[in-house]
């Protein structure tokens, strides 16, 4: 990498999971639109065909970036300036178990990738993979900045740091962005003032997918009273800011978010599908309850069908049968890369180990707060303490992250079972909990062969 005038050129980005059908395209688009960056993206994926398709798609953009599919992770990582990771840990067969096996025991999960039984088993598969990633990064590109998009986010980032303490890594999630956008819509509706998400200040703190906003303002306007009026207006029927909540598995009417504000006095800053999984079974008692709160259980069968559609789309684009235009994705990975290269500072929310940015959470717990991005540095901004009422909800999950990591490293079934039973949505007897745990262990046995 070198600088020419106000540009960073000859950059090398290693993309682990470079066959991605969605995240890779977003990165391609944002890189193509950023004129101050130039280089090569090395695409590595165990699904070689998908990586080759992305190579063809990326190179069709005719941008200042080249894309190269490589067959070894070592070649991708060697001397990389940045590493991007977005993988599916396991297959949809394992995900089917993660999400749907617990339903036989009355446990419903709207996502199943971060918490609950699904989040646990996804983590048990993911952590060993990330141990290997961290060791290879240490060997081949120890000074690279690592951007993680994979879930469970907090445990992925924790594993990277526990394995390679000097790693320069952070996790990115767009859930907070949607809540910030919702606040701007509240400001427009209640006060007639239009602004963009980036124009408002929000103090963000928590853990990934269970983040909270404790302060928010636009210029001199305190946005909490505005949001309170907005919630009061819409808390019965909801507010569908992304279209009819029934039109997409990813839409909601924000009723969970509004209910949490009513109960706890702070703004829950994630989508309802994620927020519901972190609380006791108020919102996930059964499918009928989910419908009442106007969000969705996302079936894995839909994900399988959607993946097939995305693969076909990739093939059409690669053959030139369908056009692929670069459009701004709304993600911040490229903005973060620019800032780390010294091309303009940035403040945004990211997931990194706690170094004191949250006062009442143990050090090294991976937390999500605002951080300052500047040349070769990510500096967490002090966010204060998690409010006591909110911490009562968050506490079991913070403890579970520590237990799950330890269970995965030690390959300890008893500790993993204990973590599952500790989850607030797992309201089972020990006997039934162990039956579910053993069934899910069998379903993901290929990844947990030498556990005891």
Task: Report the location of each language-model feature.
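N-terminal Rossmann-like dinucleotide-binding module
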Residues: 10-41
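Long, compositionally biased stretches enriched for glycine and/or charged residues
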Residues: 191-452
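Redox-cofactor binding/interface segments in oxidoreductases and associated redox assembly factors
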Residues: 78, 84-85, 148
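Short acidic low-complexity segments
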Residues: 66-79
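A short, basic/flexible loop-to-alpha-helix module at the beginning of a structural domain
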Residues: 1-8, 38
């Amino acid at each position: 990498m070198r600088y020419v005038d106000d540009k960073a050129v000859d950059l090398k980005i290693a993309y682990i999971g470079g066959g991605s059908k969605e995240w890779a395209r977003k990165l391609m688009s944002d890189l193509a639109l950023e004129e101050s960056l130039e280089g090569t993206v090395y695409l590595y994926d165990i699904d070689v065909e998908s990586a080759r398709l992305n190579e063809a798609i990326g190179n069709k953009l005719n941008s200042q970036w080249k894309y190269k599919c490589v067959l070894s992770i070592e070649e991708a990582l060697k001397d990389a300036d940045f590493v991007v990771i977005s993988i599916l840990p396991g297959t949809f067969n394992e995900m089917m178990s993660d999400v749907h096996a617990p339903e036989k025991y009355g446990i419903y999960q709207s996502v199943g990738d971060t918490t609950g039984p699904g989040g646990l088993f996804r983590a048990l598969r993911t952590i060993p993979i990330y141990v290997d990633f961290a060791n290879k990064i240490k060997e081949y590109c120890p000074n690279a900045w690592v951007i993680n998009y994979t879930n469970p986010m907090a445990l992925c980032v924790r594993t990277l740091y526990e394995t390679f303490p000097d790693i320069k890594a952070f996790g990115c999630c767009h859930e907070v962005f949607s809540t910030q956008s919702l606040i701007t819509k509240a400001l427009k509706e209640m006060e007639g003032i239009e602004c963009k998400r980036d124009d408002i200040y929000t103090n963000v703190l928590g853990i990934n997918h269970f983040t909270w906003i404790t302060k928010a303002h636009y210029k001199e306007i305190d946005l909490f009273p505005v949001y309170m009026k907005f919630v009061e207006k819409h808390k019965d029927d909801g507010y569908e800011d992304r279209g009819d909540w029934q039109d997409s598995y990813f839409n909601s009417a924000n009723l969970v978010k509004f209910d949490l504000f009513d109960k706890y006095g702070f703004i829950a800053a994630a989508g309802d599908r994620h927020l519901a999984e972190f609380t006791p079974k108020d919102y996930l008692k059964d499918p009928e309850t989910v419908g009442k709160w106007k969000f969705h259980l996302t079936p894995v069968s839909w994900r399988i069908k959607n993946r097939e559609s995305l693969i076909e789309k990739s093939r059409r684009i690669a053959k030139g049968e369908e056009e692929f235009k670069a459009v701004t994705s709304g993600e911040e990975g490229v903005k973060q890369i620019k800032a780390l290269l010294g091309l303009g500072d940035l403040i945004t929310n990211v997931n990194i180990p706690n170094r004191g940015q949250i006062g009442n959470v143990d050090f090294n717990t991976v937390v999500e707060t605002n951080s300052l991005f500047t040349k070769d540095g990510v500096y967490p901004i002090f966010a204060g303490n998690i409010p006591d009422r909110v911490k009562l909800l968050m506490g079991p999950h913070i403890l579970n992250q520590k237990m799950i990591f330890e269970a995965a490293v030690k390959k300890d079934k008893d500790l993993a079972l204990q973590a599952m039973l500790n989850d607030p949505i797992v309201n089972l007897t020990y006997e039934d909990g162990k039956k579910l745990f053993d069934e899910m262990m069998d379903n993901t046995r290929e990844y947990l062969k030498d556990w005891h």
